[in-house]
Amino acid sequence: MSVEQFINDQLHSIVGISDRSICQYVHALAKKAKSAPDLVEKLRDAGDFPISPAIQSFADQLMSRMPRQATSARQRGPTTAELAEQELNRLNRAVGVLEDYSASSTKTKNVRKRKESSSEDDEAPIKASKPGKSVKPSKSDDSESDIEAMEAKLDADIAERDALAARINKKEKDKTRNVMEKKRDDNKDKEGSSMDKLREESRRQYLKKRKVDKLEELEAIVHDDQTLFAREKLTKREKADMEYRKKVLEYTKAHGKAGDVMKMKRYHLPDASTKQIPSQYVEDDEEDFRPGGDGAKWEEEQLMASMLHLGAKDAKRKEQEFELLLDEKVDFIQALQMPGTNEEVVETEAEKKKMSIEETRKSLPVYAFRDAFIEAVKEHQVLIIEGETGSGKTTQLPQYLYEAGFCEGGKRIGCTQPRRVAAMSVAARVADEVGCKLGTQVGYSIRFEDCTSEKTVLKYMTDGMLLREFLNEPDLASYSVMMIDEAHERTLHTDILFGLVKDIARFRKDLKLLISSATLDAEKFSSFFDDAPIFRIPGRRFPVDIYYTQAPEADYVDAAIVTIMQIHLTQPLPGDILVFLTGQEEIETVQEALMERSKALGSKIKELIPLPVYANLPSDLQAKIFEPTPKDARKVVLATNIAETSVTIDGINYVIDPGFSKQNSFDARSGVEHLHVVTISKAAANQRAGRAGRTGPGKCFRLYTAWAYKHELEEQPIPEIQRTNLGNVVLMLKSLGIHDLVHFDFLDPPPQETLVIALEQLYALGALNHRGELTKLGRRMAEFPCDPCMSKMIIASEKYECSEEIVTIAAMLSCNAAVFYRPKAQVIHADSARKGFWSPAGDHITLMNVYNKWQESSFSQRWCVENYVQHRTMKRARDVRDQLVGLLERVEIETKSSTDTIKIRKAITAGYFYNVSKLDNTGHYKTVKHKHTTHPHPNSCLFEETPRWVVYFELVFTSKEFMREMSEIESGWLLEVAPHYYKGRELEDATNKKMPKNKGKSGKDLER
């Protein structure tokens, strides 16, 4: 009986269960154990085997059957042959060369040396087989060799993984794309031209001054000639010189007055300091061409003279003024008032404008607690900060710590934000307050953009970027203070950071941790961080009246538009409006409707200025929401839930809350991730209402009933970690060396099922081995700031030699925005332009064609306009692609190009083989594994083609579950790229099978 057969029988009798993997696991433990008690200890550490006398007896019997030499009183040293064999085995493991027992019998076999405790004769080494003879291994030897080969292969992969990580860390400083370094290089290139301009300007200023000096000198000489030498006898030459100087002086003065005398139009260089042209060189406008000039007045007089006037009959009748009525109206009832916490005098916009930056900083509520805050940070390592949005905690607290000397020794102060917009806008504001250029002392770091330098001491970043910094700096050695801001939002990355920074704080006593929250759940954070103290900062909030609708609204978008017009017509100015919507599409719909209605009403209403703000909006357009509102106008800010806490907008007195937001949810059973519009929580509703009382008493109009608020809204939002796919997070934690994910210190642990699915997906992608350890492929995947499927697609492009095309496709997919746009007035032209890029291979190749054509046009904006392509989306795709190309070199992938679309689609399938659908006999697409019904997206170029097999980027749920960005593939490719995941019978195509050629029976035959 072989050893594994013995283990299998014993486990059935002792534990009641056994399979091949458990037998191999116990066999491997027995091989590593030195004795039976040692084996019992290893089984106890495994935790799956109850230690009992039966287990101890099993360990004794198993160790007696193991092929090993017994220890004796006289130990002999290894022979030369044994040393050579050991060295050969070591080298084979290092290079990954594994023995194959299924090879030809003519190969020499290394026979395993055995030891027996009872026989002295067996102490002699077993000789290796002679080259001419064949030794047939037993089943036990085959099993042992398979395990050894697998273990050696895993060890070699781990060694390669560690070597790759070391090389990546070594290249980190040189290969990271940095905005400030690029700017410095550009400045060096421009130094020569700028110096030339400065010299030219300096020369002009010198010539002006020299002209005045020389003129005064000449006047003095002429004056001396007239007074000193008028009565003297002079030579003919001296008289000519005096006459010459006199003429030069006259001509010079006449030249200076030439512009005034002749009124000649000529170019004059403006003054360098004021940039204004002197008044004596500005010509008067001709009045005949001005409204109200002499010509216009003459025309009015002639027209009046030609018309018949009847005296009092022509007098203007005073029209009766009526109140402007709207066709639609939303009825509200006032339910309650949110009390204020600070009854300060409301400052006007003019008064705020007069305030300097320093005065503005001192006017914030947090300024009164500056000294107490610094003392609290010095006294405690972890501090929970509770302060309302607008109190100044995000912009001021890092500055206070910097001024208190927490950046000494080259350390930094970091502050995380859940959104890119918040990180960029806050960093820009702090840079203005510090008085430096953005990217020097104050910088930011977001996905695909790093605006920092070696001088940066205050660094704002997204929480995802701080997670990526853990890969290269697991102990955050360059930071003295780390502030996790907006902790109440409970984003996926923020929850992971809680566990990581809590662990770091235990062995880095010099690291200060600040956890900032804007809601009243600070006690939960305090208890998670070992009862850390809470530092409360009272906000500056005024009373807010809460209004609910009398009945539920069927269309909250239309109700929001009507409510905006109601407020604008009935509420006094000044007072801006903040509207919370779910996404870019709704924001653009409301913006367009407001512009149309304002245009239709014309001068009957005051000016209404709709301003959008969402993540994909360019920063220059986002900044418009912070600009002062013009006089006799009202600003309407259309925002996503980013305006709840991340951004503070002054001048808001009215808030419209439809009660909805977009939220990701992951279905663990089907493996599908949805983006749903869901109701907000009560905590979020109160945050939205509080925005109306930021600068003065305000009103909040909730587009739902008071009953719905009380019974349908949850108290707190569900943390993102409990409702999203954890594949990227698990890969990141594995890269950081955190293997026990079940016992990881989560603030709210994720569902066990979701965690298991993430591990299964990473194992299927090849990022993890069967021991749950990160592979070399997984370490390379972790370097890309993408989801695991996209990272695998990029790495698979190395095999198919099409990395240039794959990074282009990945960049276009990463933008999360529409590439094409369809103006309502030009729908036919827009659709025709889009079809010009279509490829029969699918949407992925179509996206690649769009980028390549734009690149051929030298990245022209005009080309985008002519082809109805979003220029903003294309610019972002170019930035993403540039960084992905840099990361290819970092993970040692050579950039190659290929025009073969089959290779490109195979690389896509290698990453997204999870997302494969098959057309069934009913004409519907169903996923291969879960038989989940999906539908082609109407904007897909394959919408009318219906290929048999397709791979898609993601599922988007609106009215149905649509496949976004799909491409046609062949079923055989799945066995090529994922033979471990798909079986041949799953990929059989029933349409290709022929029916048997059997003849049917006639009616007469049936009657018989």
Curated annotation (Swiss-Prot):
Disruption phenotype: Embryonic lethal. Defects in oocytogenesis and spermatogenesis. Approximately 80% of mutants have an abnormal somatic gonad and no vulva. GO terms for cellular component: nucleus. InterPro entries: DEAD-box_helicase_OB_fold (IPR011709), DEAD/DEAH_box_helicase_dom (IPR011545), DNA/RNA_helicase_DEAH_CS (IPR002464), HA2_WH (IPR048333), Helicase-assoc_dom (IPR007502), Helicase_ATP-bd (IPR014001), Helicase_C-like (IPR001650), P-loop_NTPase (IPR027417). Residues 374-538 form the Helicase ATP-binding domain. A motif (DEAH box) lies at residues 485-488. It catalyses: ATP + H2O = ADP + phosphate + H(+). Pfam families: DEAD (PF00270), HA2_C (PF21010), HA2_N (PF04408), Helicase_C (PF00271), OB_NTP_bind (PF07717). This is Probable pre-mRNA-splicing factor ATP-dependent RNA helicase mog-4. It comes from Caenorhabditis elegans. The lineage of its organism: Eukaryota, Metazoa, Ecdysozoa, Nematoda, Chromadorea.
